[in-house]
Amino acid sequence: MNTLVHKAQKESVALLVNRIMAEKNPEDRKKTLKRLTTIMETFFGDLFEKESFDKARKLIDEDGKWFQFLNRALDTLNPNVVRTAVMDLGFESGFYGLRTRDAAKAKYHCNIPWAILFDPTSACNLHCIGFWAAEYGHTLNLSYEVMDKIVSQGKEVGCHFYLLTGGEPLVRKADILKLCRKHPDCEFHAFTNGTLIDDDFCQEVVKVGNLSFSLSVEGFREVNDSRRGPGVFDRVMHAMDLLRQYGIVFGTSICYTRKNIQTVTSDKFLDLLISKGAWFTWYFHYMPVGNDASIDLLPTPEQRSYMVRRIREIRSVKGGKPIFAIDFQNDGQFIDGCVAGGRNYCHINPNGDIEPCVFIHYSSANINDQDLIPCLQQPLFQEYAKRQPFNHNHLRPCPMLENPQALIDMVKRTGAKSTDMQSPESVEHLCAKCQAYAKHWQPAADKLWTDIIQADKKQTEQEIS
């Protein structure tokens, strides 16, 4: 699609977004939101089922939990932050970018990601016990020029969403802000320990508008600080207070293990996050990545079954919590399984190696030496594209954790090398740690999956009738 059409569509959407933000009367806001839905359907109805737009209208009409959630965001977040997030993550990435990505996928015969996760640095101001990224070492950095190259070339193929990890990405906060300013049509999201967030930084974030945060937290003060260091919990709470004060979008990033799973999903813990102003919480299943990684932290089948149900309880319209919970391992139902290998996202480590996933440290391509498209065309990514989904039970999505033989086969077939700079881990060693887990999880996962499919079928029948 030509740039004139893109510009006209973007201006039309921006006009309505501004009007929605200015509306104070709830009924007037509803009318404008429904008008925006109709315009998006007109522009992008060929990319989505009509049902998707109908559900959006129903959500607005029902005035339920998620519509109230949206209204709270519009009323409390900084206007520039809201406007930029809607235009960058919504219009550019979710709608317009999808058409561009589909065209690029057909042209280049490879997966084109919706989001690219990259590590500006391996450096960190903390020394957390068992952090997977520590395996890379602490002296690696992507230059600003390379980060700009990633974003610039990503935009050309429709990627407008960039996630930043590390190390601690805010060690490079000046370069991150520079990227945000240069690419105002992209949304950036940093996974951070939160300790480098201060007033001056928040003021700059509000100005750019296109940077949001996930703050890492492992539980309450005692548990969190036992892994991250004394005083870190209080510093994270202070960072949340600042972000809320400035109206900046933020949530949390939580790694759940056998030891903390009950705590980090408890009402008490979630109520704390909500009271601090968190809008969402990412839950990540512990992964035994690295030669020294312990399998003792892997959740039991009973614990993971609990997690599947608990996340759905938290999100539930009735009796849930006013926070959006996402479970990276257990929400495959909504995204057709594994999203790695460029299907929806990929990872670039601080050495420039382009990996299928933040947890899969194997590659045969490096962004320092190649352009983005050849990196996405690497053999390992092509194997991912051929084999996804790795399991039709989307509670068993991963080629490492739940289907370990799949990763062994792909790495061997493509000759991809370990990207661990300090202690390279063979794929056989990595996947051996997952064999027993996968075997014991399968029966519970299969029963849960059957229950979920039947529940979804029943809900669909009720909606039709």
Regions found by a protein language model. Give the residues of each.
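Short, charged low-complexity linear segments at domain edges
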Residues: 92-113, 322-328, 332, 366-382
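Flexible mid-to-C-terminal extensions adjoining Fe-S/redox cofactors in radical SAM and related proteins
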Residues: 1-8, 12-24, 28-36, 40-51, ...
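Short cysteine clusters
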Residues: 124, 128-131, 338, 352, ...
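Radical SAM/AdoMet-radical enzyme domain recognition
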Residues: 144-164, 170-285
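Short loop/turn microsegments at loop-to-beta-strand junctions
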Residues: 116, 342-344
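Radical SAM enzyme [4Fe-4S]-AdoMet core and its adjacent flexible, acidic
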Residues: 1-54, 58, 225-341, 350-351, ...
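Conserved alpha-helical substructure of the radical SAM core
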Residues: 33-200, 465
